[in-house]
């Protein structure tokens, strides 16, 4: 039985990045592969007609390529951190149905996937936590969620396509909270110019 996702819900925000990763896997397999995205989309009951129609456009194809390069960059940075902190916490902020934590897994790190409760509900159903992995439902601006993270071996946080939806002051506050809670931790994220952010956040 497929998991149904309704239009105009928080859960619907999972669809576009997941579809973009699937599209890039199909279009540019030599650059990027996300078999999890391909598998998960087959398990979701949703009207994909709009996404499928736009996938033929040059803009959407470029967007899919951008998503792939972003994910590759994030994995590179996280894996580089794990070389010197092999038992670190790998924290995916605004995880959605993204499997990057597992893509970075070195066999000894701990993986934490943080997102809103509605999103975590879908993730627990379609992408349940594996060994050394936890899905944590939370508001990312709430520092209380950080208490559930074991950073005794270090911590590397990454946010993929997340901060576009935050105000500048919210990002500053979150980064300060993380710095206070996890001294010496690393944060990896993507950014864009103001015009691009407005287009992305529509």
Q: Can you describe what each PLM-predicted range is?
A:
Residues 135, 144-146, 165-183:
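A short, conserved alpha-helix within the catalytic core of class I
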Residues 140-143, 163-165, 193-197:
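Short, catalytically relevant binding-site loops at active-site mouths
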Residues 155-160, 171:
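A short beta-strand submotif of the Rossmann-like class I SAM-dependent methyltransferase core
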